[in-house]
Each structure stands twice: as structure tokens, then as C-alpha cells.
């Protein structure tokens, strides 16, 4: 998902602890897709309660949010609104990929394959129920969230220009939307299996500073947007044969994306609209506040309604209580 400009991005390995005492907006759908793909049973099926409701997202949001709070990182979750019409092609392609994955899963089951994880992990849907349950859990935990009018990553990036320190997301598109700082791999760090390969790699959290990316490549924000569009974004197909490094070289030589397209004899549909969307996306001003967690409601919701282990939940609820007391003074200092 998003644009792949990783080859020209300056990143720094970091840790949760090193990012403490800061507030970050979170591209929630981006995180939910990661959780639905990675938090699964041994056979690849998503975690479910006794009623057949998917709970992978609740498991991930609960434990990862507490982990952030324990490291004095204050999260503000941002939910997607109505997608831009520019994204229709991407949405259709993703739906086709899921349908293909479902067909491959059925074939694998018929063949009697035992390891179905690679198939299940490619079939993820963020349903209204998943969104509602996530918001309900965040409400009980006292964690604020913002409903974006359109793209969540655009709203989360906009918030970095106001009073949050950065955005937590895997997508480099946040840089095109002007996010001052991005934290990546904060939901999937550690030893991870490479998709569709029987090998593992260690993934470390990292941060990216927009100004460093621009300075290191000697470009401006408009040129960075042009590079992303040449490579391809959720709103357009990239130009075949052009990766981030080649796009950078072309942009620096020709000056801007329109000059590049004229030089190579190519066209990108809706170019002006795409550029404008990255520069002026639909966003809202917001007011958020961290509240005291309702630990009884959390326990009832997770344990009584969704079959979570009461013993495990209570251990983490105690951590949540302690964290709330420890962070109250800092929150007052930060947001008054």
C-alpha cells in the first residue's frame, strides 16, 4: 500500500523508549491491516471468540497501546473517512487480490495443505464491526481518536503540523502529505516471517524526518510529491520502469513532474487532482483529551464479550492503572 520511495528515504533505527514523552497520531487502518495479517492462530486463521467474531485487532490494539503508554508514548488514533474517488482503482485492485487469495485458499484446502497461514494472511477486511469495536475499546482505555473526513494518513500527517510530534504508519505516503516525522515498524517489530518465504528477518522500529529526506536528496516538498507519483501511489499507477532513485534523478534534472512527463513522453491521468490532494487533502481541526481508563468496562468487554483470558487482561489492566497515574502530570503540562 502507498508509494515505495524507501530507496531515497533517510531512516534511523530507534526504540519505543527513545520516542517517549511524545504524542503521535496513528494511521489506524494501516495498523489494523497489520494486526489482521499478523495476529493469527497457528493454522493462519484470525483470532476469534466463541461467537465467531474476529478479535485479532482487539488483541493487538489493547496490548500495543499499553506498550506505547508504558514507554510514555501518547497515541491518538485516526480513522479513515470516505475514500477519495481518485482511489477507486486501488480499491478495485485490492478487492480482486483478495478474491484471488480466497480462491487460492480454497484450492489449498482441497489439496489438503496443512499450512494455510500464507493464504489467510492475504484475506483481510476491515468491517464496520471491527472499526466500532476498536473505537469502543479505545473509549474504555481513555485513548482519544479522530475521525478523518477522508484519508486517515492525510489527517494523521496534518496533525503533525499542529500539536502531535509525528505519525505512526508504515506508509511513506505520509511524507507526501507533509508529515514532519514518521515512526515505522512500531506494530510489527521483532523477528518476523517474510511473506510467502520460509525465512525470517529482524524488524526494528525506525523514524524518518521529512526535512532530512528533503535535505539529503536536495529537493523540495513539491518535488517529493512528484517522485511519489512517478513511482506510483494509491491514487495512480506509476510509470513502468521508474523506481524511486530514477524518479529522483529525473525530477532533479527536469525540475518538476510535468517536465519529466513531457521529457519521457508519458501521461498520468488526473495529475493535477492528485497533486492537489497531497497538498490540500480534506482534514479537520480537532480537540482530543486523554481520560482515565474504565478498567471494569475493559475487562467486561474483552473477557465477558470476547473470551479474552481474565488473568492476562488483569495483569495488563494493573499496568494501565499505574501508567495513568504516572502520566497525569505530564499530560497536564503538555496539553494545557
Swiss-Prot record:
Its cofactor is Mg(2+). One of its GO terms (molecular function) is 5'-3' exonuclease activity. It is an enzyme of class 3 (hydrolase). SMART domains: HhH2, XPGI, XPGN. Mg(2+) 1 binds at residues 27, 80, 151, 153. Its EC number is 3.1.-.-. Residues 1-98 are annotated as: N-domain. Keywords: DNA damage, DNA repair, DNA replication, Endonuclease, Exonuclease, Hydrolase, Magnesium, Metal-binding, Nuclease. Mg(2+) 2 binds at residues 171, 173, 234. InterPro entries: 5-3_exonuclease_C_sf, Flap_endonuc, Flap_endonuc_arc, HhH2, PIN-like_dom_sf, XPG-I_dom, XPG/Rad2, XPG_CS. Residues 115-255 are annotated as: I-domain. It comes from the Archaea. The keyword Magnesium applies. Binds 2 magnesium ions per subunit. They probably participate in the reaction catalyzed by the enzyme. May bind an additional third magnesium ion after substrate binding. One of its GO terms (biological process) is DNA replication, removal of RNA primer. Interacts with PCNA. PCNA stimulates the nuclease activity without altering cleavage specificity. Belongs to the XPG/RAD2 endonuclease family. FEN1 subfamily. Structure-specific nuclease with 5'-flap endonuclease and 5'-3' exonuclease activities involved in DNA replication and repair. During DNA replication, cleaves the 5'-overhanging flap structure that is generated by displacement synthesis when DNA polymerase encounters the 5'-end of a downstream Okazaki fragment. Binds the unpaired 3'-DNA end and kinks the DNA to facilitate 5' cleavage specificity. Cleaves one nucleotide into the double-stranded DNA from the junction in flap DNA, leaving a nick for ligation. Also involved in the base excision repair (BER) pathway. HAMAP family: Fen. This is Flap endonuclease 1. The lineage of its organism: Archaea, Methanobacteriati, Thermoplasmatota, Thermoplasmata, Thermoplasmatales. The gene is fen.
